[in-house]
Amino acid sequence: MAETRIVVGHAPFSVGEEYPWLAERDEDGAVVTFTGKVRNHNLGDSVQALTLEHYPGMTEKALAEIVEEARGRWPLGRVTVIHRIGELWPGDEIVFVGVTSAHRSSAFDAGQFIMDYLKTRAPFWKREATPEGDRWVDARDSDKLAAKRW
């Protein structure tokens, strides 16, 4: 039976605490995880903080749809998607994607797919605090191109 966990919230997460749930199914031979962190720079400027906003309810629905689309493309076991919101600092963990499958190629591909679609389809808004002031972060062309490959 396939299982999915989706969490959007302010609380920090622990990669070490997420792994055991992903890894406990004996039918899954691959566990692939990705953890994204807040960088201390963007567009050539120093980033002092990052504030993430979302559309409650709609964001979780969009993430669930992304995971279901991944399940339609690859034979997946468990999937976890965690995305933090609120004010974050350089070095803070912001997103976690964990995917299990019988084989590594499906797990790797599905993990990349979920991240690529999360970056382009999930309703999150980012505001960076820089020494020059706050600014909203636009979607990157590279993220759009990455999503198009699927």
Regions found by a protein language model. Name each.
Residues 1-94, 102, 106-112, 116-150:
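N-terminal, polar/charged subdomain of small-to-medium soluble alpha/beta proteins
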